[in-house]
Structure formats: C-alpha cells, structure tokens
Amino acid sequence: MKRSEINAIMRDASDFIRQSGFYLPPFAYWTPADWASKADSAREIVESQMGWDITDFGHGNYEQDGLFLFTVRNGSPENIKTMSGKLYCEKIMIVDVNQRTPMHFH
C-alpha cells in the first residue's frame, strides 16, 4: 500500500472513532520527533505492539480485503504466567461496508 493510502485510512478512521465518542490516546498522534523525544515512554508502546495497524492481508486490495485496527492496550504472555499486569488486549477494529476480513490466525 502507498503511504498516501495509509495516511488517508488513518485520517478517516480517526474521524470515525471521534464521531463515535471515543478518543485515541495521545501517542496515536505523535510525530516522529515526539517518538524520539519520548523514548522511555515509547518503549512500552513499541514492546506491547500498540498503535495503528492497517492490513490488506497481502492481497493488494485494501478496499476489498482489509482491516483497520488500533491497539490501545496489549498484555504480555508473561503476564498470564504470573496472573498480574495487563491480561488482555483492547483493540478498535473497523471494517468498511462491503469490505471482507479474511479468516486468519495469530
């Protein structure tokens, strides 16, 4: 996907989420300079794989086969072993009208 397509999907999703009465965390809107200046804060975000995720499942046609996700919270498998910390994930998922999300697994 082209960066311009990804940016447009992110803008549309952000608008839709706000219109639905939900607000993404501040890191959703950080610039590259923000990420650089907040390296300590950013470590958990990166290690927990939180943030934007836009996929066409490798099919090359997001409008037909795609999914938008924003991960707000994500636990670690280590937390399950100790039954402490974040034990679940919290994701916002958007599928457009007539868009398919192929069966997949993680």
Where are these regions (language model features)?
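A short, N-terminal "cap"/entry segment at the start of jelly-roll beta-barrel domains
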Residues: 1-88
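Conserved short histidine dyad/triad with adjacent acidic residue
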Residues: 72-78, 92-106
